[in-house]
Regions:
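Short, charged/polar connector segments at secondary-structure boundaries
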Residues: 1, 6-7, 11-85, 96-102
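Residue-level marker for well-ordered alpha-helical positions
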Residues: 35, 66, 130-131, 157-158
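Glycine-centered loop/turn motif at secondary-structure junctions
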Residues: 45, 76, 141, 167-168
Length: 271
């Protein structure tokens, strides 16, 4: 049978009918903690039932318990205890995020996408952004401002987001870089590949400023990251070199005006 009662934990369902939450933001890793959980499952079984919601046709979506389901698989269990709850999508998202935020050692990327999913769910349910950010932060000991910082990380390309997870890039640096377009973020990653360096917070702010001023180039990123200033070009012309091209009655102001006009015309033709 697919279903039977389980030691007061709820119903027991075959593992094959339990599916991961759609776009589940939390990783399930085969690490030391998972190995310990597998041993516990082998010795005592699953002590806390998985929370699931019905999808129809005897299939269920896991709200809480993805690590337990994976441990059961590694331990060779074909059935796991579940508690079934009917939930709409937004309620399910909120429950999924809240249950997983209790995990230890959550990566910035996991928290980022979890916060964004919960924020969107709460907004769908009519909660304003400011209130929802405060509520989300309260449950995870983060301020509303910090919640927004984490959500900004979801706009990073994978290479940069992974660098934040590895603590190679600081959280606030990631936030600054998240305002760049994908091609601009790719420039940052290409500079990292060639120099071995990511921008500091101060450098990231300057990169963002260039982006807002529409002056950002890969060379500017490189110069900022390696700490070099772009050299200014200085041209000095002697007075007699210039005056030979002008009538004797032209004073300094007239000469300056003509030179500027000629340079403007040249620039328009060559850029």
């Amino acid at each position: 049978r697919d279903v039977e009662r389980s030691r007061g934990l709820g119903d027991v369902y075959k593992r094959q009918h339990l599916h991961s939450f759609e776009n589940h933001p939390f990783q399930v890793n085969d690490d030391e903690a998972m190995a310990e959980l597998v041993e516990s499952v082998k010795e005592e079984g699953i002590l806390t039932a998985l929370l699931v919601r019905p999808l129809g046709d005897g299939e269920y979506e896991i709200i809480a318990g993805h690590r337990r389901r994976h441990a059961a698989q590694l331990a060779g269990l074909k059935e796991v205890p579940v508690i079934i709850r009917n939930m709409d999508q937004d309620t399910a998202v909120r429950a999924m995020v809240d249950s997983n935020l209790q995990r230890p050692n959550i990566l910035p990327s996991e928290k980022a996408f979890a916060y964004r999913m919960k924020m969107e769910a709460m907004n769908h349910q009519g909660t304003s952004g400011g209130i929802s950010a405060k509520d989300i932060g309260k449950n995870a000991n983060d301020s509303a401002r910090q919640v927004y910082r984490y959500i900004r990380l979801t706009y990073l390309m994978n290479d940069l987001l992974n660098a934040v997870d590895r603590d190679v890039i600081g959280l606030q640096v990631g936030v600054e870089l998240s305002y760049l377009t994908v091609p601009e973020q790719e420039m940052v990653e290409e500079v990292h590949e060639s120099t071995g360096k990511y921008p500091s917070l101060e450098q990231a702010k300057k990169i963002r400023q260039h982006r807002e001023e529409k002056t950002l180039t890969k060379e500017i990123v490189r110069l900022l990251v390696i700490g070099e200033r772009k050299k200014k070009t200085t041209v000095t012309l002697k007075q007699d070199e210039i005056k030979k091209y002008f009538p004797p009655e032209y004073d300094e102001q007239k000469i300056r005006t003509v030179i500027c006009q000629l340079l403007e015309e040249w620039s328009n033709q060559n850029h």
